[in-house]
Structures are given as C-alpha cells and as structure tokens.
C-alpha cells in the first residue's frame, strides 16, 4: 500500500513539473512572438495543457494522500479547458476583423494566399493597398476615442 502511494505521488509530482514547464514555455512564447495571433496561440494551447496537467496532478495527489475526490478541481479543470480556447478564439477573431498585423516570415507573398481574398491574387500592390486601408481605418477608429 505504501509503495503504490509513493508511485502515485511521484506521478502527481511529474505532472505538476510538466505543467510548470509547459507554462514556462507558454510565457516565453507570449513574450517572443510578434503578433496577436501567434501570441494567442501560445497563450491558449500551451497554457490550457499546463493547467490540465497541473490540476490532474493535484487531483491525483489529493486522492492518494487525503483520500477524497475534489469536485471543485474537476469542475475547474472542465471549465478552464472549455472556456480558454473559446475566449481566445473570440479575441483572435476580433483582432482579425479589426485588421491586426499578421506576421510574415518573408516578403515572398506567393505562399500567402490563405491570408488574402481571392480577388487580390497575391500581388504586392494589393497587399500594400490593404495595409493602407487598414491604417486609414485604424486612424479613423482611434481618432473618435
């Protein structure tokens, strides 16, 4: 009985350690990435996994060492894993609709067709026109505040 308790405590500790490591990677990604879409990806995907691993580790620890099952931990686990991706999706969608800057690794626009509408045909002039319209929209939008 004592050996299984130690094994489960070790599993809980490893899950807590993995969750902390993934949260650190998420924080580095939030600081390092260039635009709102990459940052939201880093904030959502890895932090959701880190919270999942951390709460499962805490749940295992409480079950093994105290002998009770925490419904609060289970509910918080479900709540965070449902609301975090949905909330960040809404933030990214609002940023896209407001014309937020999208990071491109290089200036070659031949592979950027997914970011453009079909009538722009991936031309540099069309991208510049789109950026100019976006800047005019931003100036108009933020001057009224």
Swiss-Prot record:
It is a multi-pass membrane protein. It is found in: Cell membrane. GO terms for molecular function: sodium:proton antiporter activity. InterPro entries: PhaG_MnhG_YufB. GO terms for cellular component: plasma membrane. The chain crosses the membrane at residues 11-31, 51-71, 72-92. It comes from the Bacteria. Keywords: Antiport, Cell membrane, Ion transport, Membrane, Transmembrane, Transmembrane helix, Transport. Belongs to the CPA3 antiporters (TC 2.A.63) subunit G family. May form a heterooligomeric complex that consists of seven subunits: mnhA2, mnhB2, mnhC2, mnhD2, mnhE2, mnhF2 and mnhG2. PANTHER family: ANTIPORTER SUBUNIT MNHG2-RELATED. This is Putative antiporter subunit mnhG2.
């Amino acid at each position: 009985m004592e050996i299984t308790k130690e094994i489960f405590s070790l599993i809980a500790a490893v899950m807590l350690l993995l969750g902390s490591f993934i949260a650190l990677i998420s924080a580095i990604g939030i600081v390092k990435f260039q635009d709102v879409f990459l940052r939201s990806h880093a904030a959502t995907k890895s932090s959701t996994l880190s919270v999942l691993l951390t709460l499962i580790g805490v749940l295992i620890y409480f079950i093994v060492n105290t002998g009770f099952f925490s419904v609060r931990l289970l509910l918080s686990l479900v709540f965070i894993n449902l609301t975090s991706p949905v909330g960040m999706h809404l933030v990214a969608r609002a940023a896209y609709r407001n014309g937020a800057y999208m990071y491109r690794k290089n200036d070659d626009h031949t592979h950027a067709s997914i970011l453009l509408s079909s009538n722009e045909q991936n031309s540099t002039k069309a991208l510049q026109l789109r950026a100019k319209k976006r800047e005019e929209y931003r100036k108009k939008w933020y001057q009224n505040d």
